[in-house]
Amino acid sequence: MAQDTARQAVKFLEDCLKEAGLRDLRVILFGSRALGGATDESDVDVAIVSSSFQGKDLFERARMIRDVHVRAIREFDLPFDILMFTPEEFDSDSLSARFVRAAAGS
């Protein structure tokens, strides 16, 4: 059940972020909910990859997704842990990008 809810939440985030105008968007579920080890208390680990983040610092990126993040929390009554990447950052060999790729099961 935890995986189904998380996948619904990812779809919700993706739809809302597209409506908000984020370009070249990928929303990737990772962590325990992606790998099947989640409990009902687990958060939803999500990576958002978008070219709209290009040239933006962490705080600007957070502002860009803030309203959608709040909507998702209210809709699913779950905590979300969100990491944000440009496509180039996500495809890089950085520790955080490698972690997300591994924890997504890909």
Locations of regions flagged by a protein language model:
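Catalytic core of pol beta-like nucleotidyltransferases
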Residues: 1-28, 35-40, 51-106
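Short beta-strand->loop micro-motif that forms the acidic, two-metal-ion catalytic signature
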Residues: 45-48
